[in-house]
Amino acid sequence: MLVGIVGKPNVGKSTFFKAATLAEAEIANYPFVTIKPNEGVAYLKVPDVAKEFGKTSNPRSGYVLKQFRFIPFKLIDVAGLVPGAHEGKGMGNQFLDDLRQADVLIHVIDLSGSTNEKGESAALGSYDPAEDVKFLETELDLWYLGILNKGWQKFARTVIQEKQDICIALALQLSGLHVTENMVIEAIEELQLNKEKPHYWQEENLKSLAALLRKKTKPMIIAGNKMDLPPASEKLQSLKQQFPNYVFIGCSAEGELALREASKAALIEYIPGENNFTILKEVNLNEKQKQALSFIKTAILGRFGQTGVQQILNAAVFELLRYMAVFPGGANKLEDKDGHTLPDCFLMPPESTALDFAYKIHTDLGQNFIRAIDVRTKRAVGKDHPLKQLDIFEIVAGR
């Protein structure tokens, strides 16, 4: 599972990435700062389920802060897009191609309207960020259309001549974009296309199909950055009305980055996504740091309740992708052979079953599956039992 961060230059995309991963991404105020894609590890925030049993988890990967557990996932920051990227302008083809593997996109925009369409600094409030939403939709749709259009007539004729199923054939052709057969079936039905005569499909049909498959394979959440600047609140409400099908969440990437760096330096105690922090030793702070932390506490946390960065990460994976955090554990003992409590956590796709979970843990457990036991209720369930968020299961398997 891969999350991609997209957006034009200078909207705070690299700052968001660094805040989410605390990796060393180069951050500067000009286009093409991140020529090569930056990959990093970000974290999802969930309750530490071991607390329900009076214990604390010992994650093999990720970490625990007080009552929360942070689960790692892969995040990629692709260099800033510019209009015409699908035609290769800027380094568009490379950027879009890097996003091919992404399962969900976080589109960072400048809510303050102080970055123009080229990613250049502009007067506060002078640019409408709605244009950025439309622009990225257009670039991605044209990218998908370009892939779909490539040799379309020959492809369509071959499907007919060889009596192939167009849904299977299209899914195979577009598998690099994570298009599945079911997605193609749904899209063709929704657009009422004649699946028996794909060679009669018109350009407009292909455009609609490309756009629909893009929405299905690259769901997108909009991160409205610089939410603390004057025009941002008004812009955010306007965007929600203009694009009711998108999830918009305001954020301050700079605020989150400052808090995480201060926490890493042991200047403050801060749990990502919370509405407060504690200064550990005020004597260690210089005047500039005191002012910055005071501003974040008042103008960001006090006003909005959080910086928004953690909320966006969680929403991208748990709401848009509908993935679930599921834990393997013993019905009578949460510790592994080394004494670690609930060391593992797996992110499972929607509609996963107990059998899917067994295979995720180990192939042998899946192949020899007998039953799963819900650690909370001690109830045994079969292989088709649907998983839900924060489940804890023991897998019972034969030899």
Place the predicted regions along the sequence by residue.
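Short acidic beta-strand-loop surface patches of small beta-rich interaction domains
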Residues: 370-386
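Loop/turn positions that initiate beta-strands
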Residues: 390-391
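Non-catalytic, charge-rich alpha-helical accessory subdomains
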Residues: 158-238, 325, 330
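Short, charged beta-turn/beta-strand-edge "cap" motif at the junction between a beta-strand
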Residues: 397-399
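Short amphipathic, charge-patterned alpha-helical segments
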Residues: 351-364
